[in-house]
Amino acid sequence: MNIDQHHQLQQQHQQQMLQQQAQAQAQAQAQAQQQQQAAAAAAAANAAATTSSSPRQVSFNVSDHYQILEIVGEGAYGIVCSAIHKPSQQKVAIKKIEPFERSMLCLRTLRELKLLKHFNHENIISILAIQRPINYESFNEIYLIQELMETDLHRVIRTQNLSDDHIQYFIYQTLRALKAMHSANVLHRDLKPSNLLLNSNCDLKICDFGLARSIASQEDNYGFMTEYVATRWYRAPEIMLTFQEYTTAIDVWSVGCILAEMLSGRPLFPGRDYHNQLWLIMEVLGTPNMEDYYNIKSKRAREYIRSLPFCKKIPFSELFANTNNNTSTSNTGGRTNINPLALDLLEKLLIFNPAKRITVEDALKHPYLQLYHDPNDEPISDKIPEDFFDFDKMKDQLTIEDLKKLLYEEIMKPL
């Protein structure tokens, strides 16, 4: 073999090696691409959503008809993601709930699911669809597909001063939803700014029915408080003073607290604890008169009220008044004047004695809301059946497995 032939063989060998390396690289790239595609497919199948503030991933095992966008909310027992329903290109919210670790979460989920299916109202959040599990064995999480609302009243109050027009419209829509709920014999029991969802059109929808109950007879109220964890700042005084009977007036009180917060930009009664909460209320409303005092059925609660120093009522017009020389706007969130009609409605919403508090129907007729009030466009709802909340009456006997079966049955029913 001469040198030329040797070089020729070497060149051929090198070319073969280069070809093999190129093939190997191409195979590796193809393999990596396949892995990436598989990972992307898995991510799409699981609809994994990651918050910008956190590196953790939350898997959403939903139909590939939905493209998950981002996490928009996180609560005590659920995570909400925005998504696009691909066939219709509609933006939706998907709420993922994993309730099966605690019976209380199962109960809350069951209440919410049943009530949202019952109501069909413009100012109550609705369920568009439910992701149904393949079978009972694979039923470990719940996915509710709902209307997407951009924000909530809590966020809005924190970031801007609301105009009087906005306040009127938000209170009107809240009361309009309450009229439907109360006509169905349902108490929400947890109304607060973060449970009032809003979109860019200023449409308002009440959400979170996990603490809701039927307007029950006195004996059915036994155990009413056992799970009462509603935000203290919006709780009616009769709840803390253990009145024998709870009525629609507890929701009306919460509306009053929300109205006051919109007017001032901050909570009206931000109690540190049970005692401080009552004291803050009495500092504004004054010590109850004899009639209201004896309306409190609990002797222990009456004795507690009696032990507190006497308070004189402060009219809301005085509480929210700005000084003319602009040295203080602390009670009005920078607002230069407040509509006197708003304060008049507030006086009627925040009355200590629930029997004297304005009703939702009368609040809707109040002059402050006359721009929006239309009795022909404030629908009522069908009353819930008597056995609607039967599971609540038996909750001490129901295991998590029992509640899981009830939830599965509810989810598998048509909407």
From Swiss-Prot:
Active site per database record: 190 (proton acceptor)
EC number of the protein: 2.7.11.24
Binding site residues for ATP: 72-80, 95
Entry-linked InterPro entries: Kinase-like_dom_sf, MAP_kinase, MAP_kinase_CS, Prot_kinase_dom, Protein_kinase_ATP_BS, Ser/Thr_kinase_AS
Post-translational modification, as annotated: Dually phosphorylated on Thr-226 and Tyr-228, which activates the enzyme.
Residues annotated as transmembrane: none
UniProt domain Protein kinase: residue ranges: 66-369
Regulation: Activated by tyrosine and threonine phosphorylation.
Keyword Nucleotide-binding: yes
Highest taxon of the lineage: Eukaryota
Positions of short motif TXY: 226-228
Enzyme class: transferase
Modified residues (Phosphotyrosine): 228
Family label: Belongs to the protein kinase superfamily. CMGC Ser/Thr protein kinase family. MAP kinase subfamily.
Identification of the protein by name: Extracellular signal-regulated kinase 1
Protein species of origin: Candida albicans (strain WO-1)
Lineage of origin: Eukaryota, Fungi, Dikarya, Ascomycota, Saccharomycotina
